[in-house]
């Protein structure tokens, strides 16, 4: 089985997001890469489910809060951009200040 670079990148997001979900469920605070992966995965899945870019931009701000992440992580992530596949093509989702 051969994956394109884009497919490999998406698989890495899924794996990192699953690690982040398990750690969050155990009550651990997420670090920078874990927080990015979790939010990104939720956005990618939302696009797959048929949500609009506008809906996902709003939803992206509700996934994590400052209590879910290590000190300073929320301030490090001022913007998240990810390309997602929608029923009508690939679009860029941008979430400003995703961790409030």
Swiss-Prot record:
Its EC number is 3.5.1.5. GO terms for biological process: urea catabolic process. One of its GO terms (cellular component) is cytoplasm. It is an enzyme of class 3 (hydrolase). Its main location: cytoplasm. It comes from the Bacteria. Heterotrimer of UreA (gamma), UreB (beta) and UreC (alpha) subunits. Three heterotrimers associate to form the active enzyme. Belongs to the urease gamma subunit family. This is Urease subunit gamma. It comes from Staphylococcus epidermidis (strain ATCC 35984 / DSM 28319 / BCRC 17069 / CCUG 31568 / BM 3577 / RP62A). The lineage of its organism: Bacteria, Bacillati, Bacillota, Bacilli, Bacillales.
